[in-house]
Amino acid sequence: MKAQELRNKNVEELNAELNNLLGEQFKLRMQAATGQLQQTHQLKQVRRNIARVKTVLNQKAGE
């Protein structure tokens, strides 16, 4: 997910994307806690995608 792709979305779409990412992060954290997560890099990717979405939301709020 690129920041430019996120900037082209409206606030409602960004909030929906944020909710999806937070749900995915929760699932990955539960898998990691139970030892079922094989691809641990996914946690880092999701965390950074959440940060990207939040950054774009803050930029749009400032406009």
Curated annotation (Swiss-Prot):
The record's Gene Ontology biological-process terms are: translation
Annotated S-S bridges = none
Q: Which domain of life is it from?
A: Bacteria
**One Pfam family cited in the UniProt record for this chain:** Ribosomal_L29
Please provide the record's keywords in A-Z order.
Answer: Ribonucleoprotein, Ribosomal protein
Q: Which GO terms describe its cellular component?
A: cytosolic large ribosomal subunit
Molecular functions per Gene Ontology:
structural constituent of ribosome
InterPro entries, alphabetized: Ribosomal_protein_uL29, Ribosomal_uL29, Ribosomal_uL29_CS, Ribosomal_uL29_sf
Q: Which PROSITE patterns match?
A: RIBOSOMAL_L29 (PS00579)
NCBIfam families recorded:
L29 (TIGR00012)
Concerning PANTHER family, the annotation shows: 60S RIBOSOMAL PROTEIN L35/50S RIBOSOMAL PROTEIN L29, LARGE RIBOSOMAL SUBUNIT PROTEIN UL29C
Q: Which family does it belong to?
A: Belongs to the universal ribosomal protein uL29 family.
Query: This chain belongs to which protein, by name?
Result: Large ribosomal subunit protein uL29
Q: What is the lineage of its organism?
A: Bacteria, Pseudomonadati, Pseudomonadota, Gammaproteobacteria, Pasteurellales
